[in-house]
Amino acid sequence: MKLKDTLNLGKTAFPMRAGLPTKEPVWQKEWEDAKLYQRRQELNEGKPHFVLHDGPPYANGNIHVGHAMNHISKDIIIRSKSMSGFNAPYIPGWDTHGLPIEQVLAKQGVKRKEMDLVEYLKLCREYALSQVYKQRDDFKRLGMSGDWENLYVTLTPDYEAAQIRVFGEMANKGYIYRGAKPVYWSWSSESALAEAEIEYHDLVSTSLYYANKVKDGKGILDTDTYIVVWTTTPFTITASRGLTVGADIDYVLVQPASETRKFVVAAELLTSLSEKFGWADVQVLATYRGQELNHIVTEHPWDTAVDELVILGDHVTTDSGTGIVHTAPGFGEDDYNVGIANGLEVAVTVDERGIMMANAGPEFEGQFYDKVVPTVIEKLGNLLLAQEEISHSYPFDWRTKKPIIWRAVPQWFASVSKFRQEILDAIDKVKFHTEWGKVRLYNMIRDRGDWVISRQRAWGVPLPIFYAEDGTAIMTAETIEHVAQLFEVHGSSIWWERDAKDLLPEGFTHPGSPNGEFKKETDIMDVWFDSGSSWNGVLVNRPNLTYPADLYLEGSDQYRGWFNSSLITSVANHGVAPYKQILSQGFTLDGKGEKMSKSLGNTIAPSDVEKQFGAEILRLWVTSVDSSNDVRISMDILSQVSETYRKIRNTLRFLIANTSDFNPAQDVVAYDELRSVDKYMTIRFNQLVKTIRDAYADFEFLTIYKALVNFINVDLSAFYLDFAKDVVYIEGAKSLERRQMQTVFYDILVKITKLLTPILPHTAEEIWSYLEFEAEDFVQLSELPEAQTFANQEEVLDTWAAFMDFRGQAQKALEEARNAKVIGKSLEAHLTVYPNEVVKTLLEAVNSNVAQLLIVSDLTIAEGPAPEAAVSFEDVAFTVERAAGQVCDRCRRIDPTTAERSYQAVICDHCASIVEENFAEAVAEGFEEK
């Protein structure tokens, strides 16, 4: 036997290297085979519900790192709630209708207009489902736990029927209407868009300054006067029917020396406009308030059949332009509102493809709207005063990335204005985890217009509306419920398979159809109505869920998307928000803080992270950032997180190894019988438990990460485990001191493994497989630990807080001695302490081997004043010298009692007593050489 064999060196097969990329799929299959999600649900049956409702990602392509952050966050919440006394089911969902899938099929060579519509929709459905299953596998690879066999998908018959019923209730309440209002129109998609389907980019446009000649000045202006207008959309002049001024803005009538004409502009802008137009010696002839110019009539710049009326509008400013805007009610929301109020014609001169129509005039007909500037300039002639290129923020179709226009077309709307206050009141009852989130959603609802819910596409849920022979729209409770029942059985494709009369209830009649003939609507619903109905299709329709949901968690872009549409439909139907809480997240940026883009080559695919690091590192990264704001991610950042993971793993490996001979049923030492330092560590750990439990409850992942890493680095590695080897390796295997420390080790190991499970389930299960005395076969089936409190807890904490200050001072003294070459490592030191009464009382209260805690070989507490050469602090001073004696081959301390024993061992008296008591046979035979 060798002397080293008398040490209690920790033993474990738990590997230092995790091998996550290869091991994670094996564990995930094991969980699936063991039906862990179902078993967890059975354990939680009857407990209070916590329902996090999954906002459905769009089923197209593999998931990106933003998806990963969002879904890992959801998984952490679901797992922590499931382990905290809640019935927390997770039903993953997918959004499957809409233009992107039509675009994919078009790229694959599918020609929608040349094939049977039902066959085309079948192809859309097949592709969408293939993408659902692809993304499902992507999410499962992240280690997510959920009901993967009972997904919700917006194309299933039950979901489509539920969506129709949401629409039906809104129709019954009078919230659905048809109108020809300007809407965001995407010529590239040939469809109307909702606000949630646009994004803003900088666009360079040609802006024109031109003049309308006064035709009837109403006794205010002469007919040789021209009103100066500014536009950034020259094509809309073809549909201009008025000029709008601000009622309280001052306007001036001016005569430039170089002009025979007189002009009207905003007084505030005269100087800048004079410079722009090259006007010199400008004479101000008169000043008018905008309201004085109301109802003056001007000529259209070139269309002699059209007069343009001066009207008042609150949207006019003097921030730019001339303070006067031309008004084309068919091409803008503000234009429409003031135009209708003043009886202006709503002219639309651009078709659905962005092509100018005949009513724009023969010179324009057939041109693309954005290419007509030269023709407009030619038509304006000397009415054009200036032109310039400007860069401004402009709306684009978020799917095709092409600019859009406002265009008045007949559409179906949901009237938000009819129940806006009800929605705002519902927002006040929701808990927002960021105050700005509440303000953002509130302002969006307060300021938004009515919702355009119709789309001129094929792949989607049909609007369940019929038309009588006289054109009357039919959407009664009876007809809509009948359609819902048909969809429930056959799916929405039946709408296209049957004639209108075969989709109506048997025997249905309508006074507008004396011949019994009907037509059906060919528009489909906005996809935001699809996902915005999920509270009904999922929360209401599934018996194991609750409505409203406890939490919606999505990216901050969903304040104008899913949060918004779900809120509108839920309040319209039931008067309540579909969620009790909203938690939003920022976007994922690259390591430099730049937006990720395939064209820039700075994206990170979750699959690449899984191959290089493992999903566990991605999960840990999610907790290491404040995801309520935009966050950075790169392979370098993940490499740093991987180092943190390695530290966590190897710390827990040390605990596993050094409790391998510990049986908690037999070897646990009661708290009251622990040493003071062990009590301190037990209390500190329970403070960590409380911090983490509270942070899980508040979804504060970064708090968990910081607290956990700090505890492992500072409390364990830099202190408790730093001197632990002196006890667990050297003392007798069954000694009280060793069992005291092992009691703390084991308690921390078991509980920290449970606390880690929501974040690092793979690693937690791997650790759990080494804890043979724990009852549950999987840690995921256990409960999160409760924080304990102990008698005299504050007193113990105060004592050890003071000791940590003392320890820091001692380490400074040791460092000075090391720099002076008095010692090398701290175990070579004999530390003499010169304490005042406060420190002396402290060291007595610590009631531990202080030399062991400071990792020095010898320590003396001296009486009297410290020598001049001492390292002094306010309450204590230290001197350091090399310890007397020689190194013990067993404990490595320098000790005056170290000597060669008769059994061929050079060890100190303390080690000799342990060896002689526990290894009598080896002592009798003598130890082998090293």
UniProtKB/Swiss-Prot annotation:
Annotated motif 'HIGH' region, positions: 57-67
Residue interval(s) of motif 'KMSKS' region: 595-599
GO cellular component: cytosol
Cofactor: Zn(2+)
The entry's keywords: Aminoacyl-tRNA synthetase, ATP-binding, Cytoplasm, Ligase, Metal-binding, Nucleotide-binding, Protein biosynthesis, Zinc
Family, as annotated: Belongs to the class-I aminoacyl-tRNA synthetase family. IleS type 1 subfamily.
Name this polypeptide is given: Isoleucine--tRNA ligase
A family per Pfam: tRNA-synt_1
Annotated catalysed reactions: tRNA(Ile) + L-isoleucine + ATP = L-isoleucyl-tRNA(Ile) + AMP + diphosphate
Organism: Streptococcus pneumoniae (strain CGSP14)
Sequence positions that bind Zn(2+): C888, C891, C908, C911
Source lineage: Bacteria, Bacillati, Bacillota, Bacilli, Lactobacillales
HAMAP family: Ile_tRNA_synth_type1
Binding-site residues, L-isoleucyl-5'-AMP: E554
Compartment(s): Cytoplasm
Cofactor note: Binds 1 zinc ion per subunit.
CDD domains on file: Anticodon_Ia_Ile_BEm, IleRS_core
